[in-house]
Amino acid sequence: MNWLLVIAGAMVGAPLRYVTDRMVQLRHDAVFPWGTFAINVTGCLVLGLLTGAASAGVASPHLELLLGTGLCGALTTYSTFSYETLRLTETGAGFYAAANAIASVAAGLGAAFAGVWFAQALWA
């Protein structure tokens, strides 16, 4: 049963990542990989909210599997973040590579902490 929840979440997360990335990149035709950045920060926020909800006792383990492992696991993409950072470096866009690495980690952690804080404030 648990693996079905993960699959169901991933069936939404993977296409959502693809469509969101394409839409953001079309809107922001830039060297910086805004699509992947937006997706990963959003995924961190959702995981933070889910973690806060679980610690408050309002998110079941099944919901964690569906949204956390399935949806967010398929939505977020560390491999694409790494690949895009490497490609920026290889094409001479070292500043953008460094900005991507620093901003992605900082914004992702900030979003995760904000999600936990907001969920705990809401359900505490």
Swiss-Prot record:
One of its GO terms (molecular function) is fluoride channel activity. Signal peptide: none annotated. The keyword Acetylation does not apply. Pfam families: CRCB (PF02537). NCBIfam families: crcB (TIGR00494). Belongs to the fluoride channel Fluc/FEX (TC 1.A.43) family. HAMAP family: FluC (MF_00454). This is Fluoride-specific ion channel FluC 1.
